[in-house]
């Protein structure tokens, strides 16, 4: 507030509190529906779109859901064929990277038009100055992860793709990082997922949004 020079919180997410969620029952069907609904909402688009497919679990799930709905126009409740019925997927990496092979297998399975972009170490080094300029941070981890995404984004843009979906945020929501396995109890596991979610915006989301 400008009159008191104080920061006031106007909205609280009830799921941040462990006590508010500790008795919730796990439901794979509820998770499936929430994921499908979330992806489907993003496909209401009159411009070409694609998916970032690393070959990992998170991006593979999002890509598979997108591929399920892509052939029909979401805007018409699935009653008309989509203007761009073939979903395009994109992967980036050094030649021979195991993730690229995994992405190929997933793309073949879900039927996307797959594009694999390779870059060299020197190309990555040459791009760092531009990457730092665009993401507006010198954070080493963020710059390192943003560099291949920046190189990939340039190719995607040159193809006329205006929007892409990715698997960002899944590890934070579902505790996918390896160190989560060492959580001493459910309460600390939950508190760490909340902490990671709060850190998404200044780190991973900056990379995904600005690269």
State the predicted function of each range.
Residues 1-6, 169:
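Short acidic-glycine loop/turn motifs at beta-strand connectors
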Residues 8-10:
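Conserved S-adenosyl-L-methionine
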Residues 13-211:
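ATP-dependent adenylate-handling active sites, centered on carboxylate activation for C-N bond formation
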């Amino acid at each position: 507030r400008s009159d008191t020079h104080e920061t006031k919180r106007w909205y609280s997410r009830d799921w941040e509190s462990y006590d508010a969620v500790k008795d919730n029952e796990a439901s794979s069907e509820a998770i499936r529906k929430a994921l499908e609904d979330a992806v489907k909402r993003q496909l209401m688009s009159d411009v070409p779109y694609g998916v970032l497919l690393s070959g990992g679990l998170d991006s593979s799930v999002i890509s598979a859901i997108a591929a399920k709905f892509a052939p029909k126009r979401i805007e018409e409740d699935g009653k008309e064929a989509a203007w761009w019925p073939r979903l395009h997927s994109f992967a980036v990496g050094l030649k021979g990277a195991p993730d690229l092979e995994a992405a190929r297998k997933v793309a073949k399975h879900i039927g996307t038009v797959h594009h694999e972009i390779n870059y060299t170490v020197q190309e990555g080094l040459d791009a760092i100055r531009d990457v730092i300029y665009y993401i507006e941070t010198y954070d080493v981890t963020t710059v390192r992860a943003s560099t291949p995404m920046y190189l990939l984004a340039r190719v995607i843009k040159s193809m006329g793709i205006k929007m892409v979906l990715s698997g960002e945020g899944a590890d934070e929501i579902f505790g996918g990082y390896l160190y989560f396995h060492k959580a001493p109890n459910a309460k600390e596991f939950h508190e760490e997922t909340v902490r990671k979610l709060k850190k998404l915006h200044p780190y991973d989301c900056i990379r995904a949004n600005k690269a």
